[in-house]
Amino acid sequence: SNVNPADVESVTVLKDASASSVYGSRAAYGVVLVTTKSGSAGKASVSYNGTVGFSSPVNMPEMMSSVEFAGYMNEMKVNSGKNAPFTESAIERLGMFTADPYSEEYPGIGLNAAGDGWASAYNNQYADTDWFDYHFKDRSLRQSHNLSISGGTQKVRYMVSAGYVYQGGLIDHVEDDLDRYNLNARMSFNVKPWLKAAFNNSLAVTGIDRPMADQTIFYAQISDKYPTQVTALPVEGDYDLPSWNEVMYLKETGFERTSVSDAMSLSMTITPLDGWDITAEMKGRLDVQKSSFIMGFPKTTRPDGKVVVTSGGKQGYQYPGMHWKNTSFGSYTR
């Protein structure tokens, strides 16, 4: 996955016994050989190619409106022998809010019964929120750029390339993207008519920035949110939401991973007789990966201006207040 597609010259698949005979037991199910481009004798040649595009979410669920939600919720509760949670006046406010959202007259939320906090998502909280539309972008930028220079003489040939890939994520209001840098060098030497040498080096640096390590639970959390819950409050200050809400938690979390992979090879080929090549090859690879996960305690502002710390007991993807780092190294020589 670290290979720059612009540097690929050919892809060969070896299967079954043919792969095992060359690469051993680990290749019993086959081997994919990726050959990168190399330089040719002649003047230096400079090449550039780049692409810019956009990604968009597909098959996104369509949430019902808050008025529809209130009607179905009332019907469900009544059919189960319980009281309807939404009053007629609350449903009327839902409709008025939709026409003039987050206005001074319809801020979307009021006080709870005790007057010391915000109301729940029933009678005195009357938003019309499409949580999928709120949390996901309509489109996100993606781009790639590749620059290479190649050339050489009958004795020495070279090919050096650099690439950059950016893929923006689709989650809105937070950092969600990937950056990758590639640097490849491929050189070949005709030392003698019977002696050839080659050196290859492939370096890749990848950075991933996400709001969380596992985003699967995030999708489940937002699909469980009521459309009657607000995304904003009529007070200034830190977040203050009456129930679990991804808006404030996503801004307090962070997952970063930086990976560095450097693969090198040096080979020499001796041709004692025409048609008989003897090749000696040495390979080395260094992989370094550092991961960091941060999740804090979001602060919330009450209607009276007091700031409290939210424990976040319902958060499913990690414990709060944790800053976790991991660094791993690996290398081999063959």
PLM region spans:
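Short acidic/polar hinge/loop motifs at secondary-structure boundaries
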Residues: 1-16
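Extracytoplasmic
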Residues: 6-8, 27-31, 43-47, 263
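Short, glycine-/polar-rich solvent-exposed loops and beta-turns at beta-strand/coil boundaries
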Residues: 3-6, 23-28, 176-177, 213-215
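Non-catalytic regulatory/gating segments with a bias toward low-complexity or hydrophobic composition
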Residues: 11-12, 32-34
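Outer-membrane beta-barrel architecture
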Residues: 33-35, 47, 146-150, 186, ...
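Surface-exposed loop/interface segments of Gram-negative outer-membrane beta-barrel transport/assembly proteins
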Residues: 41-128, 165, 169-263, 281, ...
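Repeated loop/turn-to-beta-strand initiation elements of outer-membrane beta-barrel proteins
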Residues: 155-158, 194-197, 276-278
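Residue-level signature of outer-membrane beta-barrel architecture
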Residues: 36-38, 151-153, 189, 201, ...
